[in-house]
């Protein structure tokens, strides 16, 4: 499936504002919120601002490839582990996501939490909103969801090493282990790092070997 954060579903700025949730996250770091400047830097529509609108692409996928699921990345690229946001804010955000998707004849069943900031306290809201699956994290301490502020250098080092050397295991899963309770936790396997053309042949070899052995 393809995952979009739902501001991209708007056909124009008026629709973007119309579907914005009545409750908005009050992040400690205001730079995380797309609402801080009231969309001042967003132009009126797709033709003038293709960076902030994706409706023509979404409609193309919906109409030409109906078997291809379109999932949600939340309405506003919502960060579930950052300070200042609440469960009620998240529910309002997901309500807006479901509403604008339905207006485009799209039902949302799958969610990828932005920055992998999965929050177990919010899963009941997901279930209430009709979300059947979400992408969880690999089962290792350094992949545990946390805020940007709490992502330590030690965690970053382990995550990077794990892309090239098997530290956390193969991170492949039996279906019977995944299908337990709605919404189902479809854990991620690994972060696929970009190709390194210069000076990175050894790392490319290690990365591909890590993937193939799994």
Feature map (PLM): residue ranges:
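Active-site-adjacent pocket scaffolds in enzyme catalytic domains
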Residues: 33-49, 112-213
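Metal-dependent polysaccharide deacetylase catalytic core of the NodB/CE4 family, i.e.
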Residues: 5-119, 176-192, 214
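Catalytic domains of carbohydrate-active enzymes, especially glycoside hydrolases
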Residues: 1-2
